[in-house]
Amino acid sequence: MQSVNIVSTNYSRYGVSVYDRLYRKDKNVSAKHRPSSTGVYGHDASTVDHASRSNNNLNLTRSTSAISESDDVATISTNNSRRSVIKRKYKSLITASSKKLITKLYEHGSNSDSFSIFSHKTSQSHHPAQRLGTEEDLIINDLFKRKEISDLPDEVLRNILSNVKDDQRTLVNCLYVNKAFYNATKPTLYERPKFTSTYRVAQFVTSIRTNPQNGLYVRELDLSKLKNGSLNGKSTSNTGVVADSPDVDEYNPMRTRTGSVTSFTSVTSTANSNTALSITTNNKDVALAGWRDWRYRHDPLYSSPVLNSYNAKRTVSRAPSIKSSHSSSSLTLFPGLKSKESFAQLSEGKSSDNGNNGKRQRSNSSVSSITNSLMSSLYNGSHISLNTTLSGSDNNSSKTQSKGKSSSSPGNPNDSSGEQDSIISSSSQIDTNTFGMTSSKSTSSTSNWFRMKLHGNGTRKLRLRSNKAISSKKDEQQNEESAQTAQKIETPIIKRTEPFSTPHPYTNKFLLKYAQYKDLPLGYILHILDHCPYLYILDLSNLTLCTDFEIIEGRRYKGRKQRFGSSRALPVVQESVISTDVPNDLDVIYLTDSSKTYEYYDRLRNTNKHKRSSSSNNLWSIPNQGWSDAPAPIGSHKNDLRRTHSQTIGRSNVELRKLNASEIFEHIATNQKSAYNTHLRVYMKNVLWCTQDMVKSFVLENFDQQAENLGEDKSSEMFIHDMNFSFENSGLNRNFVWTCEGNLQEFIAMVVLDEVNRKDDLEIENLFNIKAERILTPTNGPERAPEVHYISNVFTVSYGFQSNKKREMKFRVTILKTDTPMYFSIKKLADDYTSVVIKLQTNKNVALHGSETADIITTDQGSVLPEDVPEDNNADDTNNGENTIAQPFSNDPKERIERITQEIVARLKDLRGSDLRRNIGENNYVRERFLL
């Protein structure tokens, strides 16, 4: 690094450029750039100059005595002497780095922006420094500086934003404030997502699969309010936005670069009357998109915006008006143009008769009408007419060309002749007339233009001459045309960075038949449960599941992007070849993750089963193969060919496994974190895919995870009280015992008692030791306490989500007598079994339909409770000294437990009475034979 030579102690002059004072040829420049007599801090300029000279007197020669002390440069007589004196006087400045700096200053000039630091210092050094205040004021401002809300910690911002957690629109807007708000809002927004559209749920699944860290924020998920795609009581306008729809964001998609709404007018009044298309609920041809539209988002047939239901309906309604308007304009311009012969006659300057037309040909107006309708359907806002756009640009071009003609000089070799200008003007007018503008020229110019188009030689010559004429003025005309066109026609731009700038899309017309469904594929639910381990509140009420399959490969290779030739190793990963974006590069785990259908994978599976390796040598026998995937010719690489061919065959070994709804319960019970699993809340109301075995396995699996904590301390029993489930009105039979809402302890009691109640009489006799010979044997059971009514042996309850992975859990049921209301508890008294203790009120019997005991129907699927029954006021208040109360059907789990217990006790009484009668009969028979 070059050393710095300090030539003066006046630091205020360091920013002043010395180039103008020392090296400019004009001597008066130094006077202009000389600083004022008073410096920045009040010192005299002559004093500063004198000090500067005194510090450098060792570097000066005797020739400096001839220079006046009042001025450093102005007293030099000639240029030669001035330069030599300057070199000697400022020798300390003439270093290697200084020479380079002076050269750059000379090249760029003193006012160049390349050295903005010098120019900034120069402009600021001439002005005195303005102090902001005293030191006390500065200290006070530093100490009492106001803090902004963005300076708060993230934890405090999260607590503030949690007050608006129910307003998702406000939370989304907070993401766009700054980085601090983004970091604080993101966990709050993902904590409780809410959805009413299956399309948004599919997007959410792709989002958490692409960014797994977002799934860690999810705590609650409510899918009970999903709606179908039908427009219920809502109408759509030409802006493409559904009014009063919670799923559709209110915005205007047609915005200009400045943010104003762009308005476009149609060519004719007929087209203008049909621009606004109103679609009501009576029209079933328009619906909002669902998860199937998101699944086929990369398919060119289903993802085309032209083919969605709204644009397709609008295109059909606008096509007749556009066709009529353009056909009228074309007939006005070319009244005799109806066939090929008339077209040829028109090119020769003749007119054709209206009669004797052999075939009707498609005119340019019909083609333009179709193109116009398709292009205008790309926009969901105001109808953009191609006629207006193109005609405006053509008018500007014609004006520019005429202006260039008048300003051209005859001596210019690049100047065009009069014939050329007439051709350019006629061609521009023909283009204008083609798009519906009125013509001011005669029919002769039109015929000349057609004749020029028909004859190739003339066309080539005219194009060459026209290109020479336009080449000299091409840049000027292009700039002028773009400026004039931008004033009249503003390009519509949608601001994607704004929140809620994208409305809810419409479904494809080929997927319109699924608009009435509000189902979700089973694979999406499993993806959510896998990527949201801290989810502890899940609401799947009113949800319909769509059949889904898991794709299983027979051979798995390490590495997702391993290729053989131009193909991927697995057909699962082969889906990501379609697009290069990140969401499409995800692994295909379930069938709904891919845009391929079931038939595709089934055909891929059957190909490997029915076709041998010899038959696979044919290129067409391998599904989804192209010429680029064909192996290399047989030659020196024969071994590589065989290896690639064998791997291609193994790649087709694909199996499909149908998913079961029980896997939802399995994922909830096994994939959740233990810290949040203790507070788990699952709601599955009004669902048909929930069965008895699913609920039993789900309840026992959660209890097994918490069973090791039971019995250690009393506080651990509170864990099972915090886990709540709801299965109201679920299952094919909605009157099962478990179709209610309660905590884990209540469901365990209902499941165990229901398991006992489902046994036959012989099993119950063995379970509760009803037979006399077993009662007389003291070794078969423990001694009974006086308050013990019935006690069972230890029995096992099998459960499991899969038939080949069944597990067992041991229980013992104890029924005690009490005069207080019913109470139950679940305790783990030993390591090998769990005790279910029920204290039953003995002086109370639950009677339905006037019966003595509860009328509970026992089936193979479990105990079924009867429907609601009104109270029987005519029933006797006393029945053998016991109160009989007729109670209606209730969703209270404690009442259900009491009813099942009463049913078990009633069956035990009947079995004991029959056994007693049988024993009495046997005793009488033995006594009679003994007497005889």
From Swiss-Prot:
Keywords: Ubl conjugation pathway. One of its GO terms (biological process) is signal transduction. Disulfide bonds: none annotated. Residues 146-193 form the F-box domain. Residues 29-63, 346-369, 389-450, 470-500, 863-893 are annotated as: Disordered. Residues 346-358, 876-890 have a biased composition (Polar residues). SUPFAM superfamilies: F-box domain. Pfam families: F-box-like. InterPro entries: F-box-like_dom_sf, F-box_dom. F-box protein probably involved in ubiquitin conjugation pathway. This is F-box protein COS111. It comes from Candida glabrata (strain ATCC 2001 / BCRC 20586 / JCM 3761 / NBRC 0622 / NRRL Y-65 / CBS 138) (Yeast). The lineage of its organism: Eukaryota, Fungi, Dikarya, Ascomycota, Saccharomycotina.
